[in-house]
């Protein structure tokens, strides 16, 4: 009887231990309330410990140092284009791979301290992307307001909350209004109602899922070789999704191209064998 009870207790303890180990630790661009945090929740559900960092580079550095299992960072926006920080960190950290992607519909709102009126606003805080996405609305409705760039849309909301002054506002999410005790002074101020942002889920494990629908890699080389690379991709039925470039900072016309396309790890291997570029595999993954 004792041995049976001991066995049951052992199984329960192992189950608890396994459950605790299975829960991922995930870094993201913070503070609390950012769209990056929302992307974490979409990808991992509520099963995870989410750690906010003040910049994309610090979120990724925590992954590199082994302080977390994954990092979730913004990649590209419909209106603002590439989030260049993400390109730079992937170029810099060769040990980092793309394990997944999340696509979110982004609704930007003008948040202010409770009781504030639009005529009160003298300064607006937001991330560079939030400012770009809401620029037309700002120019039309509060053209004289000072616009100040901060590290994230949530950081802007946090600053307004701390100042407790009706002359300040932030371009941020509806979730941040709740988190930081603010009111939505104007909803949906983005330039495009179909405004979306892609987020990458990064890890230190090299993914090579043959069933995945997307593929990402970095091509390093001269700009005049790019047409040949695109032609080779087309021949292998790899449809280009997005391409972002950064200079190598060696000679004019030499770039890093971060490319996302349809295809699998096998597609990448075939492409890498016949390319004039130095190719670096980032991952095969699906989009959520």
Task: State where each predicted segment sits.
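Bacterial N-terminal signal peptides that target proteins for export
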Residues: 1-8
């Amino acid at each position: 009887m004792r041995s049976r009870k001991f066995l049951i207790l052992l199984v329960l303890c192992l189950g608890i231990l396994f459950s605790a180990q299975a829960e991922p630790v995930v870094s993201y661009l913070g503070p609390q309330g950012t769209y990056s945090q929302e992307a974490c929740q979409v990808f991992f559900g509520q099963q995870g410990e989410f750690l906010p960092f003040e910049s994309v580079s610090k979120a990724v550095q925590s992954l590199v140092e082994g302080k977390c299992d994954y990092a979730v960072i913004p990649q590209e926006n419909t209106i603002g284009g590439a989030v260049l920080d993400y390109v730079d960190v992937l170029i810099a950290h060769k040990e980092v791979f793309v394990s997944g992607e999340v696509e979110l519909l982004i609704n930007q709102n003008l948040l202010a301290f409770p009781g504030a009126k639009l005529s009160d606003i003298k300064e607006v805080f937001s991330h560079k992307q939030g400012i770009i996405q809401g620029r037309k609305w700002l120019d039309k409705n509060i053209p004289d307001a000072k616009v100040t760039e901060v590290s994230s849309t949530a950081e802007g909301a946090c600053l307004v909350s701390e100042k407790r002054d009706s002359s300040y506002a932030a371009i941020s999410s509806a979730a941040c209004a709740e988190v930081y005790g603010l009111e939505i002074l104007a909803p949906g101020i983005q330039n495009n109602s179909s405004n979306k942002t892609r987020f990458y889920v990064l890890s230190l494990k090299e993914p090579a899922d043959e069933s995945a629908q997307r593929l990402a890699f970095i091509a390093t080389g001269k700009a005049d070789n790019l047409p040949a690379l695109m032609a080779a991709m087309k021949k292998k039925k790899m449809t280009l999704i997005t391409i972002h470039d950064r200079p190598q900072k060696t000679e004019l016309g030499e770039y890093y191209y971060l490319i996302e396309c349809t295809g699998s790890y096998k597609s990448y291997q075939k492409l890498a064998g016949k390319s004039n570029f130095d190719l670096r595999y980032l991952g095969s993954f699906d989009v959520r």
